[in-house]
Amino acid sequence: MVLHSNETFERVFLNEPVDLYIVQEAGSHVKVHVINLSDPSDKSDSSDISNTITIEQVGEGCTTELYGLAYLRGEERVTIETHVHHKVGGGTSNQLVKFVLDDHARGHFIGDLRIAPDAQHTEAHQTNRNLLLSDDAEMRTQPQLEIYADDVQATHGASTGQLDETALFYMQQRGISRQKARQLLVDAFMREVLKGAQNTDRSLCSLTEYGSIMS
């Protein structure tokens, strides 16, 4: 789809495969949340979902916000693939993608960020953070950055880890059960993306309660 000058596209995709291609003209704004949440009542789920979002900024002064979250259990597999191409200058983009993986779940993030030679004065950020709740869960992260302009602000980062045992211990010392402490830490990890999705689509008011039922 083509987003014409100064138009806005905001959308939350919840538990559905996504294949989205947007060309942004001058001054347009894109804000997309891709969220895949496991069914807490079905630990045998073996679904395999692929999400691909491609954004091309072809006009000056565009803004792009891409957020992704996957909370997976059982044998579930989810891929979130983003392509953000800055072809002209003066644009901004921010990508934040998080995975929470339990049981034998598999996550895969591919983040493609390109800044063309003519895209001076671009600001672009890409962040991928992942939380493993099981020794059998696996995460693959593939950041791909191609920056051909020199007058830009561009950052990227990726991290994969487990719950902080020190934080869990401290919370248990304060009378919080280990299971509840685990839930609270997972909630805090997911909340940034879930809250943003809720602000975009008010019908998703229950999303911020999701982590508390994933026990």
Put a short name on every predicted segment:
Residues M1-F169, Q173-I176, E192, C205-S215:
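Conserved beta-strand/loop scaffold segments within soluble protein domains that form the structured core
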Residues Q172, R178-K180, L185-A197:
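Active-site-proximal cofactor/substrate-binding loop regions of enzyme domains
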